[in-house]
């Protein structure tokens, strides 16, 4: 849907055609750019207007130019991280960094560079991405998406050619090189398969036919119970999460919608968000956060609708158990007929050694895989092997989904876009609009595993895995066990839109990486297949706290953006509400005020009793007792099973409030408290120290206090910090709150939006935007969005540049 030209379009066109009239300031020291009054001498170009905190507002005439400006601006902030990712998708990490070094995990789960390279070199050798680019839309990317990719590559390359790198992470590095549109698309592909082939890179690249007698006769089916536990852990330990809630007009002060998006993503590496506004006058005007290397806004808003995403519970892969020809382990049988596996031989250059050549083995179902994570081996024997199906290996449609969101005029258009493109691989969508509508949908690309198919075709291993984890293991020797197709699906072998869980216009729609079941606790969603996620299962502590919070907000009503802001930084620890008072009470009656630690020594915990009693149950930087409770809770949950921890077990009839009531007689409670007290004292940390004194990130020579708490603590404002007792506590954040947005409408022409990029725009320590928003996050402050032209033009630090392919 296109935007009607109006006053905004007239102003924007004027900027493009007469940019000399705009104010400009001196360039950043690492950019040599054109004055707005001196446009480039031809080729692609864009106008970039920087407002506070280094947020670029990119203005272009068409999608190729928009991609150009986006690629340029991303490179200016994140060139080293981007270049590192392009080394990954080109399969060149071993060449530049050594085969045994560890990648950052942002584009696959490979444990070392060599398997990462073997996988991505295989993708390149077979022209996988090029074939997807050649598919006509909607199965393949649209012309607009391809123009964005082409422009992005040109913009990135132009920045490299016209600027010097000041980031010490890659200054002068030979691995920082120009890219192509295929490289940009390959990064999109890597993100798409992150939950499928990307999760199994080590198992794909290690797969070899059995050579020894022992290997040929080994039992091919892992122990069912241990396999089921490993499968659950595989998906439980993902490093990405999120919260998001949409409120309908029935709950708000003005009858319009509200949206709070709070994705929890890595603070370092290639899955960081980067903030911008993208504008083509009369065509597109969207602002928000994009994953690095992306050509489009991933989570954001336009003038009428706002959306966010959460990592979904849908299982984006399945396995096919192959019955092999006894005479040849590289031949498998389907309905009794032999089919040869396809060899994919790739060579990887390795620093300090000869090139490494390996062969991967592929079937009609996908690659042969010998493990899913470290805990789920899938041995290849003379009789059995396993092939992995990942439908997102045929999905390069995410940019078109994002473009559709950017053009949407309401939640109905968001849903239409999802149905038309089916481009989201592993995320839910939560949205609200100015008309007062709310939306939750788990519209993602999933293998078409119906419960009936799993029941009819699961192998022994599949019968163990599917009910508990949603991973189907189908009998690959039977043609009638192939994945079918829905008539409304964009590609074969996946569910069509009609089968996706959808909740429209509920008072609130919320997700915290739980299943679709309780997007609204008063309107549960049921009837979907197990592969989408569980129904009637316990919620995480974070999800329980989130449901309680947003349902109370909806019941209160009269909500505004300020209420969203308050929710984001309430920092309530749900686990503290559940057990802190009971722990303090039982602590106070311990004989002699002592407890026995895990080392068998008595520890005086009497001071801890009062600290826990006085704690406000929050993870705010000024909270006293938060750190003590955090260290206690970590130790307690590490050694005590949920069945022993609670007196009142989980009930599907009351999922938000159960389980509850701490079993203080559990043997681990007093021990965990003693160990936490000993740990803090040994580190020289007072039991009643403020959280902000010992939960920090270090940026330059500055320690910045960090609010929030862990998944286990059940804090909406999630952070997963790194403990270093010798450095005084938590000194870095691995994952957590990232691009946050609170969006509403007040009847005016501009949305009411507040945003925050917790780790800031740039990873370059020499940038003024290396930690400026991190300091805001520390203080619970926000950035007021400058979406409309009048707001951009009135920015006190406005800096305008025109960038082009030629100087």
Label each PLM-derived region with a short phrase.
Residues 1-29:
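Secretory targeting and sorting signals
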Residues 280-292, 296, 300-305, 309-471, ...:
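Glycine- and hydrophobic-rich flexible loops that cap the catalytic core of alpha/beta enzyme folds
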Residues 520-598, 690, 694-807:
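Terminal end segments
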């Amino acid at each position: 849907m296109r935007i009607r030209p109006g006053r905004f379009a007239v102003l924007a066109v004027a900027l493009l055609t007469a940019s000399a009239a705009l104010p400009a300031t001196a360039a950043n020291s690492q950019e040599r750019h054109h004055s707005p009054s001196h446009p480039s001498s031809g080729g692609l170009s864009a106008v970039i207007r920087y407002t506070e905190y280094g947020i670029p507002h990119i203005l272009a005439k068409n999608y190729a130019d928009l991609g150009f400006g986006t690629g340029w601006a991303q490179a200016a902030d994140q060139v080293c991280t981007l270049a590192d990712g392009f080394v990954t998708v080109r399969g060149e990490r071993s060449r530049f960094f050594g085969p045994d070094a560890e990648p950052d995990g942002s584009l696959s789960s490979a444990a070392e560079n060599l398997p990462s390279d073997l996988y991505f070199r295989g993708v390149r050798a077979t022209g996988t991405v090029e074939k997807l680019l050649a598919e006509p839309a909607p199965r393949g990317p649209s012309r607009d998406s391809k123009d964005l990719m082409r422009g992005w590559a040109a913009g990135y390359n132009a920045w490299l050619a016209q600027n010097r790198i000041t980031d010490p992470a890659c200054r002068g590095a030979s691995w920082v090189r120009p890219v192509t549109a295929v490289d940009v698309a390959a990064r999109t592909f890597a993100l798409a398969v992150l939950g499928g082939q990307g999760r199994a890179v080590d198992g794909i690249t290690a797969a070899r036919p059995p050579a020894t007698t022992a290997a040929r006769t080994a039992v091919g089916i892992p122990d069912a119970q241990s396999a089921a536990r490993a499968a659950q852990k595989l998906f439980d330990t993902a490093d990405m999460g999120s919260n998001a809630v949409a409120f309908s007009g029935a709950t708000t002060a003005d009858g319009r919608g509200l949206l709070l998006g709070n994705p929890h993503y890595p603070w370092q590496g290639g899955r960081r968000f980067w903030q911008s506004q993208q504008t083509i006058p009369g065509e597109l005007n969207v602002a928000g956060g994009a994953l690095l290397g992306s050509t489009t806004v991933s989570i954001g808003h336009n003038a009428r609708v706002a959306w966010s995403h959460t990592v979904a519970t849908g299982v984006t892969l399945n396995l096919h158990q192959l019955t092999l020809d006894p005479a040849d382990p590289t031949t498998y049988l389907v309905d009794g007929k032999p089919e040869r596996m396809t060899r994919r031989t790739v060579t990887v250059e390795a620093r300090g050694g000869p090139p490494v050549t390996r062969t991967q083995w592929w079937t009609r179902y996908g690659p042969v895989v010998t493990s899913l994570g470290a805990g789920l081996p899938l041995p290849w024997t003379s009789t059995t092997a396993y092939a992995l199906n990942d439908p997102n290996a045929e999905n390069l449609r995410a940019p078109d989904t994002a473009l559709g969101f950017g053009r949407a005029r309401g939640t109905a258009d968001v849903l239409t876009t999802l149905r038309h493109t089916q481009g989201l691989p592993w995320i839910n969508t939560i949205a609200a609009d100015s008309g007062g509508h709310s939306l939750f949908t788990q519209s993602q690309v999933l293998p078409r595993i119906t419960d009936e198919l799993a029941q009819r075709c699961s192998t022994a291993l599949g019968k163990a895995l599917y009910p508990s984890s949603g991973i189907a293991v189908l009998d690959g020797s039977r043609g009638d066990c192939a994945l079918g197709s829905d008539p409304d699906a964009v590609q074969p072998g996946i569910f069509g839109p009609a089968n996706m869980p959808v909740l429209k216009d509920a008072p609130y729609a919320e997700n915290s990486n739980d299943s679709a079941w309780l997007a609204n606790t008063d309107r549960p969603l049921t009837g979907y297949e197990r592969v989408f996620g569980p129904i009637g299962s316990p919620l995480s502590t974070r999800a329980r706290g989130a449901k309680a919070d947003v349902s109370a907000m909806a019941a209160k009503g009269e909500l505004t953006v300020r209420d969203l802001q308050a929710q984001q930084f309430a920092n309530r620890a749900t686990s503290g509400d559940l057990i802190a008072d009971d722990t303090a009470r039982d602590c106070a009656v311990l004989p002699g005020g002592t407890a026995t630690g895990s080392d068998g020594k008595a520890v005086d915990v009497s001071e801890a009793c009062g600290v826990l009693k006085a704690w406000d149950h929050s993870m705010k930087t000024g909270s006293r007792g938060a750190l003590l409770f955090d260290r206690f809770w970590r130790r307690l949950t590490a050694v005590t099973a949920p069945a022993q921890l609670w007196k009142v077990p989980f009930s599907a009839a009351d999922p938000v409030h159960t389980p509850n009531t701490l079993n203080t007689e559990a043997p681990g409670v007093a021990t965990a408290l003693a160990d936490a007290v000993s740990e803090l004292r040994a580190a020289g940390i007072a039991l009643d120290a403020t959280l902000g004194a010992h939960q920090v990130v270090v940026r330059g020579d500055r320690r910045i206090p960090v609010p929030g708490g862990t998944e286990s603590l059940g804090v909406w404002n999630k952070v997963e910090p790194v403990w270093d007792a010798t450095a005084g506590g938590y000194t870095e954040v691995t994952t957590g709150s990232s691009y946050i947005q609170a969006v509403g409408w007040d009847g005016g022409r501009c949305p009411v939006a507040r945003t925050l990029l917790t780790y800031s725009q740039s990873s370059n320590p020499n940038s003024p935007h290396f930690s400026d928003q991190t300091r805001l996050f520390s203080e619970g402050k926000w950035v007021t969005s400058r979406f409309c032209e009048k707001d951009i033009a009135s920015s006190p630090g406005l800096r305008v540049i025109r960038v082009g392919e030629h100087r």
